[in-house]
Design a protein with these regions (language model features):
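Non-heme Fe(II)/2-oxoglutarate
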Residues: 1-61, 232
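A generic secondary-structure signal for well-formed alpha-helical elements
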Residues: 13-17, 53, 62-66, 109, ...
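Short, glycine/charge-rich beta-strand/loop segments that flank catalytic centers
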Residues: 25-28, 73-80
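Short, conserved, surface-exposed binding loops centered on an aromatic residue
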Residues: 47, 67-70, 79-80, 96-101
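Conserved short histidine dyad/triad with adjacent acidic residue
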Residues: 62, 80-97
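A short coil-to-beta-strand element that immediately follows conserved catalytic motifs
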Residues: 65-75, 119
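Catalytic core of Fe(II)/2-oxoglutarate
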Residues: 95-103, 112-234
Length: 234
């Protein structure tokens, strides 16, 4: 985007105290999806990535037929990571909130100016599995990263080591069919980083138990709150 617009988006981000804190063994970050609570520019840029022309172009670049954006922002919206924040290696939930569509693409638009590579908070992808080194995709200002989501698309965010805030606008695209023939339904499943054996056992057990719940209750016991409830004003 034009740098001036990207700066406006960055300046429109709310304080982390006005966002939802997600802090556990799995992750430590701030997120928001109820976009009518924030600067209107943020909602505008999120849905700009859902414009039919943009969705079609991204689908063509990624060789995906008929991708569909998610107006509900299920796990999408905005996120902020401050010093000490992190996101452990994980697989994104395989479906949309109603389990009708397959999640196929993750769009991450980074808007923090002057975010140095040494600050951390970067996307890491693990194409050769968690026993091998990840590939780092730096969260540089005004950069859009598009990542495939499937049964083996392990990814993480490196710990933020800088006294600052890395801001991101995120979207997911869905499809009637999965990206690979191996794909099966799964909840968001976390693992630990290499060498963290005890943490890894805990996180794998956590994912196993949550999968067990979803086998009985298709949409889970409680509704995932991370969606944009547009009828809230009605």
């Amino acid at each position: 985007m034009p740098e001036e617009l990207a700066l406006q988006i960055s300046n429109a981000f709310p304080k982390k105290e006005a966002m939802v804190l997600k802090k556990s063994l799995r992750e430590y970050k701030y997120v928001a999806a109820q976009m009518d609570q924030y600067n209107p520019l943020l909602e505008q840029v999120i849905y700009a990535f859902q414009d039919e022309r943009i969705v079609k172009l991204v689908g063509e670049i990624c060789s995906i037929e008929n991708p569909e954006p998610d107006e509900n922002l299920y796990a999408g919206g905005i996120s902020l990571m401050a010093e000490g924040n992190f996101l452990n290696p994980h697989l994104d939930n395989s479906h949309d909130k109603n389990r009708n569509k397959w999640r196929v693409l993750n769009l991450l638009y980074y808007v923090t100016p002057n975010w140095e590579d040494s600050y951390g908070g970067h996307l890491e992808v693990w194409p050769k599995g968690l026993d091998n080194e990840p590939i780092t995709i730096y969260s540089r200002f005004n950069r859009l990263t598009v990542m495939a989501t499937h049964q083996k698309s392990w990814h993480s965010v490196s710990p933020v080591t800088h006294n600052g805030e890395r801001c991101c606008v995120s979207n997911y695209y869905f499809s009637d069919t999965p990206l690979t023939n191996e794909d099966q339904f799964h909840v968001t499943s976390f693992r630990a980083r290499p060498g963290q054996k005890i943490k890894d056992v805990i996180l794998q057990t956590d994912a196993f138990l949550r999968m067990g719940v979803r086998k009985v209750f298709k949409k889970g016991i409680t509704e995932n709150p991370h969606v944009y409830k547009k009828d809230k004003e009605e």
